[in-house]
């Protein structure tokens, strides 16, 4: 940096990287927009822009000087109480973007027409960005709150490091609690869902306190049930929390609620269990301080008739009475509820409060559990999948966040497979990784024994709670089953940590063995998608949203693509592996994304045919009947340590298909294309290319010591930038849990006008000779789970290329056969999409 420069110079090293100490100018108007940087060594670009636009509100200004800035925060909120007629069909949510020019930080309002940049995770924290058109907007409900609006922007690449020490130009942006730029009473939401508490409005400071009961009248729940209709004032309740639900956000535009939240507590005394509803601003005040097992004294509450459509969780104790005719309501006002946490040491035997009881089951017991049963599990995490999202309703802006995990408890070769939805515990949900003690309560059993492979997994409910730390002293540590499992976990070694996996594409739940069974669970109008509609499906997906569709076509070509890297016998931080060549979309991404207010997404910015692809897996024939293979990754087939002195003795069969007869086909080594494809491929109306496998799609072997980096890679993009600790490794430096490469499969539409390339990655373990016994392409795609067992298998180890040759031949046998392909599609963000062939059906 030159000390003679009046303005920060453009370039990748500029954005937010000024490290000199700068004193704030104290001459600004309190809460005002303009604060002049009189004594700054470097002139603030943000200051210059603000001075240029404040006199012309709502007028777009094209900037004569565009310099790179860094993005420090992207925050979402509902615009609750401002006119929404300025934009036709305005979006439900708005975004504030905090930028830094190296001198000042500024919180800016993103024009709603650019919201899709956040939906697609193109505009995200940590990147370099150039803003070329802006406007000024005043919040008339706040003094001096002029807002810098972003109307045209170019999103660049992530920066290695950004200084977070620069001050805000506008002191109002530093106020606590942090409030959005627009709306008088709005608050920030979690970036990717509405269930997680986010921001500094959520308190954690409520502690148990000694209470003098001398002048306090207490009523039992059963007595209250009989008399509440005739009462105006209610005596205090002394209860224990047995269940706590996740948060429900019910905010809507033009509803003037300060914090529109709701949560349920199931509480009990000696006479029964009842639902308690905590409303609105009381949730940020108390939610994070309340936990299952606490004793509460509730005063100044209200009582109402229970909501008829809500299903209460059953008491764990079958002798406990379930009170379902009334609900206890807690509010910050009308009346203002008084809540006291009573310390456990003050508990008196005459209160007869129920103890906290768990319903732990072992993995060996799960096979006999009926569908929809509720249970608790404890064990060790052996697989932690990436965070994904699904729409709550079609055409909705609201999403569920979830991830797939495997839990082992030593009672079975198979793990618990759990679909873990967000439980309003982001501090847990975002910090789980393999080899962690894991407790999850109130899980529901999902099963279908008539399906092949059998469907059996657990899913969270509204009352599920997760614990990964603070186990000591918890009531469940005295449970007989839990104690045995805890002892088993203590015997696990670091060596076994090598058999754990994190992240990547996870093809679960499996689809049924026939298309007729598959179609029973799909709405008729959305059962089949034309290949020409696939592009639109992909464009409509938001960040980490996954969708499963079915297409019809003909397999006309297949190509085997082995991994082009080798796993070295070194720590992940020292293991450098060559990544696959970037797709066209990745190359385009490096040039950045340019977008302006009111413009539609340009063709160059769509996640189109050049986007990368995801892996699809199959399983070994010997486990087709069950969904629960032990989640153990396999070593890299090309590892120098493995290959040296251990070359396979089985002759390669990759050329065994070269003399195939029958239909017209050409098979050369590791690829095949049909005569139909040679005739049609140059006259297609459209060809969608999704054959690339992105590094994020590949499950990685978990390595202790790198848990923070790996966890961050497979979590959702954060709302605020956190500087890295030292120089972080790269994801493709971590060894893949796959040993066989992937296949690029070309499917031609039935009308021979459009084709699509998709990725298919079969299950393969070089330790297991049975994986080479692939009879047909169809058999290979009848998988059960992601990872093969760890049990050693005697016999010769087949060459991966020999297995690939079998799969190529199996695909060739389907020449000109009309098939139905089940595709899993996921938006990975930043114009990267994975499309995976999960299953193929032939006409029944």
Swiss-Prot record:
| GO BP annotations listed | negative regulation of double-strand break repair via homologous recombination; regulation of DNA repair
Please provide, alphabetically and separated by semicolons, the GO molecular function terms listed in this UniProt record.
single-stranded DNA binding
Pfam families, sorted = RADX
Q: Which domain of life is it from?
A: Eukaryota
Region annotation (Disordered) maps to: 571-609, 626-664
Q: Which GO terms describe its cellular component?
A: replication fork
The UniProt keyword set, sorted, is: Chromosome, DNA-binding
The reply on keyword Protein biosynthesis is no
Question: Major location, coarse class?
Answer: nucleus
Return the InterPro entries for the record. NA-bd_OB-fold, RADX
What ranges does the record list as Polar residues composition bias? 572-587, 652-662
Quote the biased-composition stretches of kind Basic and acidic residues, using this chain's numbering.
590-608
Query: In which residue ranges does the UniProt entry place its DNA-binding region annotation?
Result: 228-331
* Entry-linked SUPFAM superfamilies: Nucleic acid-binding proteins
* Localization per Swiss-Prot or TrEMBL: Chromosome
Q: Which PANTHER family match?
A: RPA-RELATED PROTEIN RADX
- Relate the protein's function as given in its record: Single-stranded DNA-binding protein recruited to replication forks to maintain genome stability. Prevents fork collapse by antagonizing the accumulation of RAD51 at forks to ensure the proper balance of fork remodeling and protection without interfering with the capacity of cells to complete homologous recombination of double-strand breaks.
What is the name of this protein? Answer: RPA-related protein RADX
